[in-house]
Each structure stands twice: as structure tokens, then as C-alpha cells.
């Protein structure tokens, strides 16, 4: 819709004004291999999109988003739209013809396709088409049976495709019906994902900007050093480095070899 497009442009303008212009160490990553050009103390910032409502069926708008530097697109939030059904849509349909066309454009542009909010049918449809696929903020459904999490079958297929899962820190997606969700509960997800062959496919997606409840000790991004410190009690330094950044760098290197 026009309203969604206007809001998208407003958010991009805020990103440019508040993130890039006011923080000299922040550099926009407009293609994935720009990460390798960052200098010491510089931080890369990436524009991503959740929900295709902003461009609808207008591929001119989609092209503009690519030109602005959007490098990851999730077709839906939890609801359905012109591209796909989200995980909250009860009918559980998959990608539309339009959604498939958008993914093909993502492939051409080396833009990631994000499956975190898709219905299960949309997930499987996406895996058939997308060259660069990941779940930006999801967990393991076997450990926490929330619809937003991925089943063992989905995770194995994602890894087989070369895709990644970035863990989400929203307590309800980590441990359902638990008043005090801890880092130990997140470790349960990491252990399980590793047992499925995901050691080289795990990252952290957090979702700090989208949640108002928190894992104890992970209330904001400033707690990442503490989180890493805690993970080192469970895993080797090499494995923790993989989870924190090495896996993702390897992933994007496969997008831009």
C-alpha cells in the first residue's frame, strides 16, 4: 500500500540520519562483501525488510529497495499478504506466484530470503527456489513448540541447502510457560541444533527491537559480552566464535564468493 511504502521510506531515512550520519564508525553494507572492507573499529549496518506489504506487486519499488541497499527480505510477518502466508495464517497456504517472482529477484541481486515468519508451506516453497536462505530470528521447535520455531525436518533441510538459523531471544520462543527464561534455556536450543548438523549454521538474531520481554542477562545488545562469557562455560572458544560471527561471515562469503 502507499501507506506502507511511505513508512518504509521514512524508516530508511531514519536509518541514514540517526545511524549513519550521527555515528561515524557506522558504515552501511550495501553488498555483502562490503563487510570485508570494514576497518578496525568500524561497524557494518545492514538494511533488511520484514513483510512485502511495502512494495506490494510493484517491482519498481522493489528495485528501489535493492538500490537503497536492502540485503535481506522476509516476505511476511505472521499474517498473509500478496506474496505468501505467514505462520499465523490458519489456512497454511504457501507462496503465491508473486512471492516466487520476488525470491527469483532476490537470487539475482544476491539478497537473502528470510523464512522466520513464513508458514510451513511457504517455508518449503521457499527452499525450492531461494539460493540464499536463512531464518533471521527463530529457534528449535523440538525444544520450544511454538509455531514461530522450526521443526527438526525444517532445520535439517535448511542446513542441507546451506542456510542458517539465527536464534531469537524472545522468551516465549525460547521456553514456553516459563517465568524466568535463562541463557541456559538458549543453550538447550544450541545443543539441539548442533545435534542436527547445525554447528556451522548457527548465529544470533536477537530481535531486541521487536520484543518487550527478555531472557535474563540478555536485556539489550550491550549484554552480548556477558552472553559470550556464559557460552564459553558450555562450548569451546572456537565454537563460540563460530556462533558469534564466523558462521555468518562464511555464509555471506558463499553469497559473494
Language model feature labels by segment:
Residues 77, 206, 247:
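Residues that line or immediately flank small-molecule/substrate-binding pockets and catalytic motifs
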Residues 219-257:
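Mid-to-C-terminal alpha-helical segments outside catalytic/metal-binding sites
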Residues 177-180, 211-218, 231-234:
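Outer-membrane beta-barrel pore domains
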Residues 168, 197-218:
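Short acidic/histidine-rich active-site segments
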Residues 1-168, 172-174, 187, 191-194, ...:
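Extended, charged catalytic domains and RNA/DNA-binding interfaces, predominantly
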Residues 125, 203-204, 241-245:
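Beta-strand segments within the central parallel beta-sheet cores of soluble alpha/beta enzyme folds
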Amino acid at each position: 500500500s502507499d501507506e506502507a511504502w511511505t513508512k518504509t521510506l521514512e524508516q530508511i531515512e531514519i536509518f541514514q540520519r540517526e545511524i549513519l550520519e550521527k555515528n561515524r564508525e557506522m558504515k552501511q553494507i550495501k553488498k555483502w562483501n562490503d563487510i570485508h572492507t570494514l576497518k578496525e573499529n568500524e561497524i557494518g549496518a545492514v538494511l533488511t525488510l520484514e513483510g512485502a506489504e511495502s512494495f506490494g506487486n510493484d517491482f519498481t519499488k522493489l528495485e528501489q529497495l535493492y538500490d537503497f541497499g536492502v540485503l535481506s527480505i522476509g516476505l511476511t510477518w505472521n499474517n498473509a499478504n500478496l506474496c505468501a502466508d505467514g505462520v499465523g495464517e490458519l489456512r497454511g497456504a504457501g507462496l503465491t506466484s508473486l512471492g516466487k517472482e520476488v525470491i527469483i529477484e532476490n537470487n539475482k541481486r544476491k539478497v537473502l530470503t528470510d523464512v522466520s515468519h513464513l508458514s510451513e508451506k511457504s517455508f518449503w516453497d521457499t527452499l525450492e527456489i531461494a539460493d540464499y536462505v536463512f531464518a533471521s530470528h527463530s529457534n528449535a521447535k523440538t525444544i520450544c513448540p511454538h509455531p514461530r520455531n522450526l521443526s527438526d525436518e525444517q532445520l535439517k533441510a535448511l542446513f542441507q541447502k546451506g542456510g542458517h538459523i539465527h536464534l531469537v531471544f524472545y522468551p516465549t520462543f525460547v521456553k514456553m510457560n516459563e517465568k524466568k527464561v535463562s541463557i541456559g534455556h538458549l543453550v538447550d536450543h544450541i545443543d539441539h541444533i548442533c545435534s542436527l548438523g547445525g554447528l556451522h549454521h548457527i548465529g544470533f538474531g536477537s530481535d531486541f527491537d521487536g520484543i518487550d520481554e527478555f531472557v535474563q542477562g540478555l536485556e539489550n545488545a550491550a549484554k552480548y559480552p556477558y552472553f559470550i562469557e556464559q557460552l564459553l562455560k558450555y562450548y569451546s572458544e572456537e565454537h563460540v566464535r563460530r556462533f558469534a560471527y564466523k558462521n555468518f561471515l562464511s555464509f555471506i562469503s558463499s553469497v559473494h564468493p
